Regions:
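Alpha/beta enzyme core
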Residues: 51-76, 94-100, 114-235, 253-258
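Generic long, charged, amphipathic alpha-helical segments
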Residues: 486-521
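Active-site beta-loop-alpha junctions enriched in small/polar residues
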Residues: 47, 82-84, 108-114, 140-142, ...
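Mixed-charge, glycine-accented linear interaction segment located at domain edges/termini
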Residues: 523-555
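Catalytic alpha/beta core domains of metabolic enzymes, predominantly
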Residues: 214-217, 224-342
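A mid-to-C-terminal "edge-of-domain" accessory segment
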Residues: 35-39, 45, 284, 290-459, ...
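N-terminal capping/small domains of soluble enzymes
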Residues: 6-7, 11-12, 30-117, 361-370, ...
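Short beta-alpha connecting loops at secondary-structure transitions
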Residues: 210-212, 264-272, 284-296, 356-363, ...
Length: 555
């Protein structure tokens, strides 16, 4: 069947004029005209992102994230599906009370039900009730879904698309049509896929967005199909990709290269299955690498902050290996790499980390060279250069310690102490002369007790403290003993404690070495220290002593 030749009158009824694109005011302000070469960013973190495992937002959370995205300059923020749950209805009510400076809030929904007029479809009416300037609806492109999921005819599916969009345009909404399974549908039946997209365009859709819903399309295929859509459609074309084969961002870039002017995605790549197009990658790729107008460079400098903020609100541990904004995105470990970066930064960096609000990090390990030590020490405020006589000693000591099981990549407090002691710039603030840890109680209740004896100059202190466990008891006893000499320790707290058993496959469980990493804070800063020993108490004590000594060194 030649769907492309079906007359416009068939979609809207005989004698009904095709709706014209509307210049809409009100409902959040004037719609901006699409600038030449502008690629608009459409964020769906609050809807599609929450379909990812472990991702959930309260109404208050959604409003906070939306406001952050608005400040960042995202062009559209999809708030949710008002027909699906009370939470999203409440979000849209609250969003309507706010003034949005840069973004337009979008409500999301589907085409009308089969054999029901759009004006009578409750879900479609709720999209109008949301009072957003933009409505995004999805419809079927793939005949498999039309016949087996919707269980309707190809003709009725096209009518559902056209009728819904026409109704929304009549109600003065900007309409973005998400062509679900657009790429798989086109590969299955190009003629029918194009007919659905043209139906959306003729009904007045401002955008037809090609969705790689299953996330399995290759960039070359995306490029080819996007180019065809651009040739066949006069409205704007967008792209919505999923990351099932790790190509969501690459596919979005391919679409933009072929003329797509809207990219949909989520912050940090949240989304169903393996996630959506990660906007923290796509945005700098489009703006900085491709040189396209999108989010301004001044705002992209806040991208790392935006990424961390959304993770924090979602209560998700940040992905340190995330491109551009991750903690290791600009981290250098290999000695030859660091030596080159020390001379010419871009010799091993694709971009200046500050353009996205990130920073360069130099890691120190058994792979380190002299340049690693120098740059890391300078980063920590220690005066040192390649000609410092003690540099060889420091490097040897680091490699020996790493061989014993120490890991200084995440324990910069202990590393700073090692370097300063090797340089002769640290004098012991105290000496631990003795300690004892014991546990008493029965099967139902027990108490850990730690006793320590410390010397500061010619004075000694001998204290006892109870704790929830041996490490907590030691921490309390040490700070109690030293507080009289160093009041600054009053604010120091142990905030995290991690244990890793080393070389357990080559030794019995009791003989294996234990590495302890401690996070401490004084309510202003955080620092990390490490200890290694076959005895977990000894390893913990090393890390605790380094933690206290590092804080006193800062004083």
């Amino acid at each position: 069947m030649n769907y492309s030749t079906w007359p416009s009158a068939w979609f809207f009824g005989a004698g009904v004029a095709r709706p014209q694109a509307l210049e809409i005011t009100g409902l959040g302000g004037n719609f901006r005209p699409l600038m030449k070469n502008l690629v608009e960013i459409y964020d769906t973190t609050l809807r599609d992102g929450t379909q990812g495992e472990g991702v959930s937002f309260s109404v208050a959370d959604k409003l906070r994230v939306a406001e952050k995205l608005d400040a960042f300059g995202v062009h559209y923020v999809e708030g949710g599906w008002p027909g699906s749950n009370p939470k999203d209805i409440e979000f849209f009510k609250e969003a309507a009370k706010r003034k949005w400076r840069n973004t337009q809030i979008a409500a999301f929904g589907s085409t009308r039900r089969k054999k029901v007029a759009a004006k009578d479809d409750q879900q479609v009416k709720l999209l109008i009730d949301a009072e957003t300037p933009v409505v995004t609806i999805f419809g079927k492109t793939w005949l498999l879904h039309v016949r087996e999921v919707l269980r309707t005819t190809p003709k009725e599916n096209i009518a559902m698309i056209a009728d819904t969009i026409a109704f929304l345009k009549k109600n003065k909404r900007k309409v973005i049509y998400d062509a679900e399974h657009a790429l798989d549908g086109y590969k299955d039946d190009p003629e029918y896929a194009l007919a659905t997209w043209k139906a959306a365009e003729e009904a007045g859709a401002d955008f037809v967005v090609l969705c790689d819903t299953n996330g399995g399309t290759l960039p070359s295929e995306v490029a080819e199909i996007t180019a065809i859509a651009k040739k066949e459609l006069s409205c704007q074309v967008g792209i919505h990709t999923h990351n099932d084969i790790g190509l969501a961002v690459a596919n979005a870039v391919s679409a933009v290269e072929q003329g797509a002017t809207q990219v949909q995605g989520t912050i940090n790549g949240y989304g169903e299955r393996t996630g959506n197009c990660n906007l923290t990658c796509a945005i700098p790729n489009i703006s900085l690498k491709m040189g396209r107008r999108s989010i301004t460079k001044s705002r992209i400098k806040k991208l790392s902050d935006l990424s961390r903020f959304v993770d924090e609100v979602a209560n998700i541990i940040p992905n340190r290996r995330q491109p551009w904004v991750g903690g290791t995105a600009f981290a250098h470990k290999g000695g030859m790499h660091v030596n080159a970066v020390q001379k010419v930064a871009h010799s091993f960096e694709h971009a200046d980390p500050t353009v996205v609000g990130n920073k360069r990090r130099i890691l120190v390990s058994d792979l380190a060279g002299r340049s690693n030590i120098v740059m890391k020490a300078q980063e920590m405020g220690i005066r040192i250069n390649n000609d410092t006589p003690e540099l060889k000693t420091i490097l040897t000591k680091v490699k020996e310690q790493e061989h014993l099981g120490y890991d200084y990549e995440g324990a910069e407090g202990s590393l700073a102490l090692l370097i300063r002691k090797s340089l002769g710039r640290v004098y012991p603030a105290f000496d631990l002369e003795a300690y004892h840890v014991s546990m008493r109680g029965d099967a139902l209740e027990h108490v850990c007790e730690a006793t320590v004896k410390v010397r500061v100059g010619d004075k000694t202190a001998h204290t006892v403290a109870d704790g929830d466990g041996p490490v907590n008891a030691l921490d309390q006893a040490l700070r109690n003993a030293l507080r009289g000499f160093y009041p600054v320790l009053e604010m120091v707290r142990l905030t995290d404690y991690k244990v890793r058993i080393l070389n357990s496959s080559r030794a019995s469980g009791t003989a294996a070495k234990t590495r302890v990493l401690i996070e401490s804070t004084d309510c202003k800063e955080r620092w990390y220290t490490v200890g290694v020993n076959e005895n977990i108490i000894e390893a913990s004590l090393q890390a605790l002593l380094d933690s206290i000594e590092f804080r006193l060194l800062k004083k």
